[in-house]
């Protein structure tokens, strides 16, 4: 499954690069597919590339949903429903 996430563009860099902020985490991404992106835009990031812009209200709503999912979903390192994916089958 592939997942693209909204992130706010906080810095433009040389060579069609930019820095995005996602809940305090900053990451350098490629803006090669988004020539018109400006600081302050919310962009959709997929595998290190900005692939589109998103309305700020929609971006905030999506980020709130991700935060809620994180609160109710167990961490990936915890077994789900008593199962341990690292155990050998019996």
Curated annotation (Swiss-Prot):
Record protein name field: Hydrogenase maturation factor HypC
Organism of this sequence: Cupriavidus necator (strain ATCC 17699 / DSM 428 / KCTC 22496 / NCIMB 10442 / H16 / Stanier 337)
Keywords: Plasmid
Family: Belongs to the HupF/HypC family.
GO terms classed as biological process: protein maturation
Xref: InterPro entries: Hydgase_assmbl_chp_CS, Hydrogenase_HupF/HypC
GO molecular function: carbon dioxide binding; iron ion binding
Task of the protein: Involved in the maturation of [NiFe] hydrogenases. Involved in the biosynthesis of the Fe(CN)(2)CO cofactor.
Pathway stated in the Swiss-Prot or TrEMBL entry: Protein modification; [NiFe] hydrogenase maturation
């Amino acid at each position: 499954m592939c997942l693209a996430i909204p992130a706010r563009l906080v810095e433009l860099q040389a060579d069609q690069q930019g820095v995005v902020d996602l809940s305090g985490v900053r990451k350098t991404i490629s803006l090669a597919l988004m020539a018109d992106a400006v600081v302050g835009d919310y962009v959709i990031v997929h595998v290190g590339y900005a692939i589109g812009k998103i309305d700020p209200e929609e971006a905030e709503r999506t980020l709130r949903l991700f935060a809620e999912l994180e609160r109710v979903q167990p961490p990936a390192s915890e077994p789900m429903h008593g199962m341990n994916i690292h155990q050998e089958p019996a």
